[in-house]
Amino acid sequence: MQLVIAEKTSVARNIAKVLHATNVKDGYLEGKEYLVSWCIGHLIELASADQYRDDWKAWKYETLPMIPENWKYQIKESTKGQFRVLKELLHRADITEVICATDAGREGELIFRLVYNQAECKLPFKRLWISSMEEKAILEGFQQLKDGHEYDDLYYSAVARSEADWLVGINATRLFTVLYHHRLIVGRVQTPTLAMLVEREKSIENFQKEKYYLVHLLMDGLDAVSSRIKEKSAAVQMMEDMKDETAQILSVKKEKKKVQPPKLYDLTTLQREANRLLGFTAQQTLDYTQSLYEKKLVTYPRTDSQYLTDDMEENALLVVGAVNSMFPEMSIKGSEPDIKRLLNSKKVSDHHAIIPTVEITNMDLKALPGGEKEILMLIASKLLCASEQEYIYESIKTEISCHGELFTASGKNVLQYGWKEVEERFFKSYGKNAEKPEEEESDFPDIKIGQVFECVVVKFSEHFTAPPKHYTEDTLLSAMEHAGSSDMIEDAERKGLGTPATRAAIIEKLIEKGFIERKKKQILPTADGRNLIRILPEMIKSPKLTAEWENDLTLISRGQKNVEEFLFEIEKMVTKLVSDNGQPVEEYQKLFSDGRKEIGKCPRCDNKVYVGKRNYYCSGSDCSFTLWKNNRFFESQGKTLDEATVRKLLSEKQVHFKDLVSEKTKRKYEATIKMEVSETGNPKFQLIFPERKKGKKNEE
């Protein structure tokens, strides 16, 4: 009997169906040859600092830097039940081999290995590595299982990543929190990302806009413009001089240009375009695409490649046919797809580009949730565009003379729409929901050198130099992807902050912590975010340094760099960070003056509890007690954690309601919600129902 361990319940069910393991048990599915179970994401995590040494429980400068001699792991409180199931299965007498079927990537590898190690399993294990949840792909994957130890280097890179995040995050967070007496959360990747946002806002604020003017000659469909003019009076004078004058074409430069079809989507380019065109956040796009993957409608989403492998030509042709049949509004009749352009095995590392699967022909697309359908259409349109012909146009630039002044005009005439026709059809299918990129005007008039225009129409227009634009999720993802690239060697394996799989979570975490905020499509740093970056030294907020670390992690996964060497560099940096920042900067202490609103006393340590933007948090530096305003338990009962409720919970440890709403029946009921706080500061809630009256006495 073989035990298959997947990352999520939904994936486990898909695999179990293919393997005919359909007998439902508690925490797993059973068949004649296979047991299939799951992890619910990370079941095991690095132990918190206070699990190593007693003196690490207190947040004090003297305890820094905290560098564990031997790393400890702990089972997550919320997943202990499923870990217990997996441990029992891993030690079941009839299990002879384990198959790792977690997501085929760095974090998926870590999720499985930590469970395997924590359970002290000694069984041999193999690796399932697939890029699609289609039945055919799963069956082929099981026919081509690899020895699990072939992915040891990938596991080592995942361990190095998690330990580096712990070292930087724990030490830097405690250091600056202690120095400035304010909870300041610092992260290896999130802090440099925040620094880029703050730097962009500084550039915008410091930008000095300048006014300038352009004079226009309007002649038979041509709009020729002058060079920039600083003074309005000069522009007006030039306009007056041009009235009733003749203009002559001095030069006409025509150039045939070809624009190659776009590449297929990797996760980052998909997230960027979904944000720009459809307004989705990076996390929404990842969630929608992951759901489509689990429904077998698209291939694996967490990829950094924009190509298919050389052996996928036949399958890709089938998928193009499926897309054309399911989305006729985007297809071009009679077009011959160029599949070979999409193939390049050398540019595919772990997973190929994101494309639809042939399973879309078996799906009622109308039954898909709106967001998923839009993402599927976006992925489908990109496949059609990428396999279409070139977009060819004639670029035209002309110089025109009038009253001794030089004017220019430019435009183009389209010779072949090619892939642009598919793109145009996609935009039309969305109407106002998609932002079509601005394009130069087509149908440039036919002009010749020496041609003269009599009595031209003249006008002038006022303009301002433009500051840098605020980051959107689209442009921030691009900045994260390319951060530090200009300072790195040309053949660096990876450049940037984070990975395609983690960038969305980094953005969401910065929002959750109150360091950045969304305003429509813009992403802006908050006052807390600006202040945090202001006090931090360059070494901890440098995108270049973090990009180098990400490159090192990729080299570790390739077996080209030693884990111990990498972590030694991290430890050196953390040690220097602590030694260089022994005292707070006096002028920065004012940034974190206590203007917060107190709401009660902490039930764990008796320190003040303050009202935050999204939570109620303990002010104690060594206490993690927090109540989130969008608490899931309260929301499931039809309530929110407002200030009145929190005051009651903090003072009495319970609050009584007469109008709770059942999540299942939607009926109102009466109960008391009681709060208990664990030693680690985690609040837990339970419902206490009033005693039912057995009967009513008659009163006389």
What are the language-model segments listed below?
Residues 30-32, 218-222, 401-405, 665:
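Short strand-coil-strand connectors
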Residues 2-3, 25, 79, 90, ...:
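Basic, low-complexity terminal or inter-domain segments flanking catalytic cores
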Residues 93, 137-219, 254-258:
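C-terminal or mid-to-C-terminal helical accessory/interaction module adjacent to the motor/catalytic core
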Residues 160, 232-265, 271:
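Metal- or metallocofactor-binding catalytic centers and their adjacent structured scaffolds
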Residues 1-162, 166, 432, 467:
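Intrinsically disordered, low-complexity regulatory segments
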Residues 9-16, 33-36, 40, 76-87, ...:
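Amphipathic alpha-helical transducer elements in NTP-driven molecular machines
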